Design a protein with these regions (language model features):
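Sec-dependent bacterial lipoprotein signal peptides
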Residues: 1-12
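Short N-terminal helix-initiation segments at or just after the protein's N-terminus
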Residues: 16-33, 95-99, 113-126, 144-150
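Short amphipathic beta-strand/extended segments with alternating polar/hydrophobic composition
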Residues: 46-49, 92-95, 169-170
Length: 210
């Protein structure tokens, strides 16, 4: 997806802080039961409002919103897509193992989250054309997610073809996983996707094995 390609996989020399893990794309992402998702590939749960839909397959409409259709052979695979069929507002969840040497702190998470906005204006115009207007970049903020040690959020708002949009990204870490959450809100009169999005994020939880 245009400028919001969260590639925060990095490494540094030194003593390993965790065993080497790999992305198990052969394992099913998880189980959808009504409006509840329970992860199998990675240990997280999330629920959506009744009028939203969830799928582990890439929704076709997201190509028009700037997302690239993933290749089945990609080493990184998004575990869950959730969206409002009426407005096409959506939120997508991905987890991936952290590298053996990667170390995390809240300060570092916030710094990496903020760094994504470096070329955001030019990237938006390249992806959407010159019709993009009123681009505003929001602050980098810590965010509390259940079962997550460190997390930060940032967003950008803009207008395209008379419609206001918000695109945001959340980057988090809970040993031994990195967490990537991308969302898009397409505003429509009479629909409160922003409130729905908050409920979805409030329901998200990384389950710690006991």
């Amino acid at each position: 997806m245009m400028m919001i390609v969260l590639v925060f996989l990095f490494g540094c020399a030194g003593v390993p802080v965790r065993p080497a893990l790999k992305e198990e794309i052969g394992v099913p992402p998880g189980k959808i039961d009504g409006n509840q998702f329970t992860g199998i590939r990675y240990p997280f749960e999330v629920s959506v409002p009744p009028h939203w839909k969830m799928t582990t397959e890439f929704p076709d409409f997201m190509v028009e919103l700037g997302y690239e259709r993933p290749d089945p052979t990609d080493k990184e695979q998004t575990e869950l897509y959730a969206y409002n069929p009426e407005t096409k507002s959506n939120i997508n969840f991905d987890m991936t193992p952290a590298g053996r040497h990667d170390r995390f702190s809240q300060k570092m998470i916030e710094s990496l989250t903020a760094s994504v906005t470096g070329n955001i204006k030019s990237d938006l115009e390249k992806e959407r054309g010159k019709g993009v207007a009123n681009i505003e970049i929001g602050p980098t903020e810590p965010i509390s997610l259940k079962g997550v040690q460190y997390a930060a959020k940032k967003h950008v708002t803009y207008t395209l073809k008379g419609q206001k949009r918000e695109q945001g990204w959340i980057y988090g870490f809970m040993e031994p996983y990195q967490i990537f959450i991308l969302y898009t809100i397409l505003e429509k009169e009479g629909v409160n996707d922003r409130q729905d999005m908050k409920k979805i994020l409030d329901s998200f939880e990384v389950i710690t094995k006991k």
